[in-house]
A protein has these predicted regions:
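Short, hinge-like loop/turn segments at secondary-structure boundaries
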Residues: 70-73, 93-95, 158-162, 203-207
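Acidic-and-aromatic substrate-binding clefts and catalytic sites of carbohydrate-active enzymes
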Residues: 56-58, 81-87, 150-152, 164-172
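Substrate-binding clefts and catalytic carboxylate motifs of secreted carbohydrate-active enzymes
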Residues: 105-107, 124-135, 143, 154-155, ...
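Active-site flanking residues adjacent to catalytic metal/cofactor-binding acidic residues
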Residues: 76, 111, 158, 189-190
Length: 243
């Protein structure tokens, strides 16, 4: 990661075009056969995606195996941010289990920790966790998904700032933060909170149909297209993960 030029893979610049993913699939739940892991990653790649965020827990090892084989980059994410012995042990177990997977480009230590993400406690905890993580693996940047309060707390301390829904603070949010913290790399860990029903192009709330037109459904979120235009037009932003 480069704070001004984004992300580089094997020395070549690459814009991250990622997705957030829970570990479940229609019809089978979370206990997926290995072949379905391959199918999901191949399908995402066919859409043009090159990165996969494990939201919001460590994935099954078979998913990481598929990403290694097929060339999908990964954010590996711990379940709960914290500095207790139990929480640090969970982070350590994840990192020791997964660190030999070449697909992993970043460890995520948090997602939308609203109670602490915007204050000094969050910043101190981030530094403690980050320092601990680097005793296990120094080759990857630490990130966190942050949903606001980017001027304080976690966003002032983490290696790679993760913006969740920049509409919270206006489109100039990332530019302002980059000016104030020019040494921190950054990307969009969640953007584009759009709801759609496949093959449906009209709205019917009684049937819970939503038109498949990439329309923003929240006052706090852009459409995927709006979000991507922002992240793609700024060299310092490594890329974006669709929610």
């Amino acid at each position: 990661f480069d704070a001004n030029r984004g992300f580089f893979l094997n020395g070549k610049h690459l814009k991250i075009k990622g997705t957030n993913n829970h570990q479940d699939h229609a019809g089978v739940g979370v206990a997926m056969p290995d072949g379905l892991q391959d199918f999901r990653i191949k399908t995402l790649k066919s859409f043009g995606s090159n990165a996969y965020r494990c939201s919001h827990n460590p994935p099954t090892p078979e998913l990481l195996d598929a990403c290694d084989r097929l060339g999908m980059l990964v954010i590996d994410e711990t379940r709960l941010m914290g500095i207790t012995s139990t929480q640090l042990s969970e982070l350590k177990r994840m990192m020791l289990r997964d660190r030999n997977h070449p697909s992993i480009i970043s460890w995520s230590i948090a997602n939308e920790e609203w109670g602490i993400e915007g204050d000094i406690k969050g910043a101190r905890m981030t530094r403690t966790i980050q320092d601990y993580a680097k005793t296990i693996d120094t080759t990857r940047g630490i990130t966190a998904g942050i949903s606001g309060n980017w001027d304080n707390g976690i966003a002032t301390a983490v290696d790679v700032v993760g913006y969740n829904y920049i509409k919270h603070g206006g489109k100039e949010t990332t530019d302002k933060h980059h000016r104030e913290f020019p040494n921190l790399a950054s990307w969009g860990t969640e953007e584009g909170s759009t709801f759609a029903t496949r093959g449906i192009y009209f709205e019917d709330n009684e049937k819970q149909y939503k038109p498949a037109y990439d329309l923003p459904q929240s006052a706090n979120a852009h459409s995927i297209e709006q979000g991507w235009k922002h992240y793609d037009s700024r060299d310092y932003l490594a890329g974006m993960f669709i929610w």
